UniProtKB/Swiss-Prot annotation:
Name assigned to this protein: tRNA pseudouridine synthase A
Family: Belongs to the tRNA pseudouridine synthase TruA family.
Binding-site residues for substrate, renumbered to this chain: Y110
Domain of life assignment: Bacteria
Subunit (UniProt): Homodimer.
Enzyme class: isomerase
GO biological process: tRNA pseudouridine synthesis
Matches recorded under InterPro entries: PsdUridine_synth_cat_dom_sf, PsdUridine_synth_TruA, PsdUridine_synth_TruA_a/b_dom, PsdUridine_synth_TruA_C, TruA/RsuA/RluB/E/F_N
Keywords on record: Isomerase, tRNA processing
SUPFAM superfamilies xrefs: Pseudouridine synthase (SSF55120)
């Protein structure tokens, strides 16, 4: 028996998220079926982050235990021959039995992409939110967001239906920047609440459009005014960039060669 880790990229447009659900098309379901074809028995998979319906991943991390003669570094090629073009295994490696895709991660990184141009761009439409009511003030958005860094109770940024015992988590870093017409919101945290990033982005857009002040934004989450947090950004603009570990087991995760070109920092 060996433990194998996968670095996975997927277009979540037509999937109901990562986690298996009854009568739903999910990433985990497709991957598990591919593993079943290889081994002829059920293999349990674990992910660094549970992406929701319509959310993408450029560097999702998954592991599973398997009793098979196939070398750990060969699973990428074997699985890619069985998976649809919307799911790609970028790298596969054998890891220690104690290593866990979810619990060994120091933090996770999500990026939200807003297309703030006057006109939609069909070439990036499935991976960004076209939002143009006015030019967004990304500096105002950044300043408003910075107070969220550190460990806080983000109850206001949690959708109903979560089974977490509490809403406290630690944001390691948050950044908002403009690359031409794209606004990139990057959040790195030890963990994320259900719907957290999309709710944060929805509120930050209101700040950028000067519909609410940074002070109102802060008041809403600090004082847990969940009923005032109604705007959730569409799923298609959200991407799970990667999970970061103290012991990095992958080679490709050290750089951005697996990240969509139009989302790379500084691209113009």
């Amino acid at each position: 028996m060996k433990r194998v880790a996968l670095l996975v990229q997927y277009d979540g447009s037509h999937y109901s998220g990562w986690q298996k659900q009854k009568n739903a098309n999910t990433i985990q379901e497709i991957l598990d079926k591919a593993l079943l074809k290889i081994t002829n028995h059920t293999v349990k998979t674990f992910a660094a982050g549970r992406t929701d319906a319509g959310v993408h991943a450029s560097g999702q991390v998954i592991h599973f235990d398997i009793d098979c003669v196939i070398p750990g570094n060969s699973y990428s090629d074997v699985l890619n021959s069985l998976l649809p073009s919307t799911i790609r295994i970028l790298e596969s490696v054998e890891v220690k039995d104690s290593w866990h895709a979810c619990y060994s991660a120091s933090y996770r990184h999500y990026r939200y992409v807003i297309n703030n141009s006057k006109f939609p761009n069909l070439f990036i439409n499935n991976w960004s939110w076209h939002r143009y009511q006015k030019v967004l003030d990304e500096v105002l958005m950044l300043n408003a967001s910075k107070k969220m860094e550190g460990e806080h109770d983000f109850f206001a940024f949690q959708k109903s239906g979560s089974n977490r015992q509490n809403s406290i988590t630690k944001i390691k870093n948050i950044d908002v920047k403009r690359v031409e017409d794209l606004i990139l919101v990057d959040i790195k945290a030890t963990g994320f609440l259900y719907g957290m990033v999309r709710l944060i982005v929805g509120q930050l857009v209101l700040v950028g459009e000067k519909k609410i002040s940074p002070e109102i934004f802060t008041d809403r989450w600090v004082n847990k005014k969940k009923n005032d947090v109604k705007e959730s950004a569409p799923a298609k603009g959200l991407c799970f960039v990667n999970a970061v570990y103290e012991e990095n087991v992958f080679k490709k995760i050290k750089n951005n060669d697996f990240f969509p070109i139009f989302l790379i920092e500084g691209f113009s």
